[in-house]
A protein has these predicted regions:
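Generic alpha-helical secondary structure signal
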Residues: 14-18, 62-65
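Short, well-ordered beta-strand segments in beta-rich or mixed alpha/beta enzyme
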Residues: 3-9, 39-71
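Disordered, low-complexity tails and leader-like regions
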Residues: 2, 17, 88-92
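Glycine-rich beta-strand-turn "strand-cap" elements at beta-sheet edges
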Residues: 37-53, 76-98
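Non-catalytic surface loops within mature trypsin-like serine protease
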Residues: 11-13, 58-60, 94-96
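Short amphipathic alpha-helical segments
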Residues: 15-41, 72-76
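N-terminal acidic leader/helix
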Residues: 6-11, 24-26, 32, 89-91
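Absolute protein N-terminus
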Residues: 1-2, 98
Length: 98
């Protein structure tokens, strides 16, 4: 059973959100070069461009730990961005892509 984690981040301004998106893109590209398995989608609210939502899908608890460890080692996001975060996590019980 896979696990889904949705994080809604609201930044102080659009520039902080854009910086977060750019850093996330770089982390994703590096993960692909290293053949590290990550599965996420990132969306930006078109009417509130300072709001970014990340949707992560993990295989299991072990995979969550591996991804979080990878991200902590490769994370260069400055603390000054400090968005407000709302997180939703749950087991996937139905997935139309499976």
């Amino acid at each position: 059973m896979s696990i889904m984690r949705i994080t809604v981040r609201t930044f102080q301004n659009e520039q902080h959100a854009e910086m977060f998106v750019a850093i996330s893109q770089k982390i994703y590209e590096d993960a692909m070069k290293n053949n590290f398995k990550i599965n996420f989608t990132m969306i930006q609210n078109p009417s509130l461009k300072n709001q970014v939502t990340s949707i992560w899908k993990y295989d299991n608890e072990k995979h969550i730990k591996e991804v979080r460890s990878y991200l902590s080692k490769h994370n260069s996001i400055p603390n000054s961005l400090s968005p407000k975060e709302v997180v939703f996590t749950g087991d996937v019980i139905l997935d139309s892509n499976s």
